[in-house]
Regions:
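Solvent-exposed loop segments of extracellular immunoglobulin-like
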Residues: 8-17
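Surface-exposed, flexible coil segments in extracellular/virion-facing regions
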Residues: 19-42, 586
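Acidic Gly/Asp/Thr-rich repetitive segments characteristic of extracellular carbohydrate-active
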Residues: 77-115, 120, 126, 467-469, ...
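Extracellular beta-strand-rich solenoid/capping regions of secreted or surface-exposed proteins
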Residues: 122-140, 147-172, 177-194, 211-227, ...
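Short glycine/acidic-rich loop motifs that flank beta-strands on beta-rich extracellular proteins
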Residues: 124, 150-159, 179-186, 206-217, ...
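Right-handed parallel beta-helix
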Residues: 142-143, 167-178, 194-206, 226-245, ...
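C-terminal accessory segments
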Residues: 439-449, 463-530
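Extracellular/luminal regions of secreted and cell-surface proteins that mediate adhesion/ECM remodeling
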Residues: 533-606
């Protein structure tokens, strides 16, 4: 509290002595020593009267006493928010009534339950800095499925639920909506809002909204922008939430001079944004885990940025995420897709890490990047599955599994890249413009597109086969190029069933898979899923011809026997006459245990 005088005359040599008393009649006691300034900063903890003794040339005068009432901190305990009841000692009729009760701080942990079915609550709520909060004295809001909604109309106040410097708040099971036609920072944290948790909440921006001021969830350095840098927040956790629509869907931006630490987005659904599914800047140690990113219902579509990491990101852990179904309502769109976008240089020992992610079901006619790592150094991509297999596409643009133009130290191992996308555009499993920077090995680089110029790899020269790529680049010596034979891609199950990618990886420190299943510590599987053939095996009983019998083309037939318990539905066979192998996948077999069948190659042997 600041004490000062108004209406007094000022002269040389005056001194000021502030005094306090519990009653207006005194006695008053001095607060510290006298000063030549009339301004005094004090901490007021109880209600008292204050006056100032002004002395000039030995003469003293007293100011009129002023009563300063100090409200006590809000007591810890359990409370309710219920619009059907008036605000009282234990209930608050609105969220703002609850917020106002915290203005003088808290004296203990607070739990407030929004009574089920008591909403919706149509109000704009901004919590500020709350004294007394700590890791023990927390504030918990249990939404119980209620809706907090607001239609912002001005750029200076675009939020519905705002945490302005608020710490140690937990919000559970609350739906928050922004319905403004231009402004909708639905849930927005800024100004050093730290140590907050949002669990099982839903944050909705307007359907098909395109304004850059529409962001379902944001942490930034500005009251009015979801993507501005500055003092934003650290150690915030968003878990089990759904973020819907927006221009940006989920944005976390720190301070350019001191990046934010400890922010996490875990097991969330990030849906139907116009442009950026995520937008991360100036973060150290960001965790982005177990999230599903898609655009299943949005009808107006633009360029798709999935996981976007740019300036100031180091030590990011991006794992177990699924990016899929991003052009569901317009598969003929020619907009570009950047599934994972990273344009930042980390440093040695502070690499950004990408593991156990699945990119699939990208049904469009535009250029597609699985990993877009433009000018990005010091990163690691392990055990990712990239399936760019939309055979109905007519794309003329390029398709990339990995697009990498960094010049220092990046590592691509144990990944599956399968491309059978239609269209006449050029395709690459891996594209390294500075190959000396790349460690690339133990990958499945499968190319089976029906049209276009199709390449396994690029290092300044394009190579159409794995053997040529290995010889020409010196990369991927232990890699394979086989159809992964995904178990059920129609239901997003991209577990391989091809034994040639089983146990074919190398240990890189990723000890579990996308589902949390433990990986082999010596021979992990390629791709995001650790799997076992588990009673699935076949033997070759016989094949013909076994030797040249006469000149001319001959059909090679192989008799396959199911030697294990599981039914064999598909199998991949190959033969070679000393040149490039002829590979064919046979599907729809239905070969049960103990039975055999004849399989004939369509490409004849000469």
């Amino acid at each position: 509290m600041v004490l000062s005088l108004t209406g007094n005359s000022v002269g040389s040599g005056q001194t000021y002595q502030w005094q306090e008393s519990t009653t207006i009649g005194g006695p008053f006691t001095n607060i510290g020593a006298s000063s030549n300034s009339s301004v005094l900063n004090i901490l007021a903890s109880t209600t008292k009267y204050y006056q100032c003794e002004v002395t000039c040339s030995g003469n003293s005068q007293l100011s009129t006493p002023v009563l300063v009432t100090v409200n006590p901190s809000f007591p810890g305990g359990n409370y309710t928010i219920n619009s059907a009841l008036p605000t009282s000692g234990s209930n608050f009729q609105t969220f703002n009534d609850f917020k106002n009760a915290l203005n003088c701080g808290i004296a203990g942990a607070i739990v407030v339950n929004v009574v089920a079915g008591s909403g919706p609550y149509n109000e704009q709520v901004e919590f500020g800095e709350i004294t007394g909060v700590s890791s023990v004295n927390t504030i918990t809001i249990n939404g119980n499925g209620n809706v907090l909604t607001y239609g912002a109309t001005v750029s200076t106040a675009p939020g519905t639920l705002v945490l302005n410097g608020t710490d140690y708040m937990t919000v559970n099971n609350l739906t928050v909506e922004g319905t403004g036609t231009t402004y909708a920072l639905v849930c927005h944290l800024w100004n050093n809002a730290d140590n907050n948790t949002f669990s099982n909440c839903t944050f909705n921006a307007p359907v098909n909204g395109t304004s850059t001021s529409m962001v379902p969830f944001s942490i930034s350095g500005s009251a009015t922008s979801g993507t501005a840098s500055g003092n934003s927040g650290i150690n915030n956790v968003i878990t089990g939430c759904t973020m819907f629509s927006g221009y940006y869907n989920t944005a976390i931006v720190g301070n350019s001079s001191l990046p934010s630490t400890g922010n996490q987005v875990i097991n969330c659904n990030i849906l139907d944004q116009y442009n950026y599914a995520t937008y991360f800047l100036y973060q150290n140690g960001l965790v982005f885990r177990g999230n599903t990113l898609s655009r299943p219902t949005r009808t107006n579509l633009s360029t798709y940025y999935g996981i976007y990491l740019s300036t100031g990101n180091t030590n990011a852990l991006v794992e177990r995420n699924k990016i899929r179904n991003t052009f569901a309502t317009n598969p003929t769109s020619t907009s570009i897709q950047y599934s994972i976008y990273c344009t930042i240089d980390a440093t040695l020992g502070n690499e950004n890490k990408f593991s156990n992610n699945v990119i699939s079901d990208i049904n469009s006619n535009g250029t597609v990047y699985g990993f877009y790592m433009s000018g990005s150094d010091y990163w690691k991509a392990y055990h990712n599955t990239i399936s760019l297999d939309d055979a109905s596409s007519t794309a003329t643009g390029t398709t990339y599994g990995f697009y990498c133009t960094g010049s220092l130290a990046y590592d691509v191992r144990n990944n599956i890249v399968s491309i059978s996308r239609g269209g006449t555009g050029t395709k690459y499993d891996v594209y390294y413009s500075n190959p000396s920077a790349a460690t690339s090995d133990y990958n499945d680089l499968y190319m089976n597109a029906s049209a276009g110029t199709n390449n396994i790899g690029y290092n300044g020269t394009a190579y159409t086969t794995l053997a040529a790529w290995q010889s020409g680049s010196g990369k991927d010596a232990n890699s394979v190029s086989v159809d992964p034979l995904y178990v059920a891609p129609g239901t997003y199950d991209y577990t391989p069933s091809n034994g040639l990618v089983n146990d074919a990886g190398t240990p890189v420190g990723v000890t579990d898979d996308i589902n949390g299943a433990p990986r082999s510590l010596t021979s992990p599987d390629m791709g995001a899923y650790e799997f076992s053939l588990g009673g699935l095996d076949a033997g070759i009983t016989w094949f013909t011809p076994t030797s040249p019998s006469s000149p001319g083309l001959k059909t090679i037939t192989v008799n396959i026997d199911n030697t294990q318990a599981q039914t064999i539905n598909s199998i991949q066979l190959s033969y070679s006459d000393g040149g490039a192998p002829v590979v064919q996948t046979f599907t729809g077999l239905g070969l049960t245990s103990g039975n055999n069948t004849n399989l004939s190659f369509t490409t004849q042997y000469n």
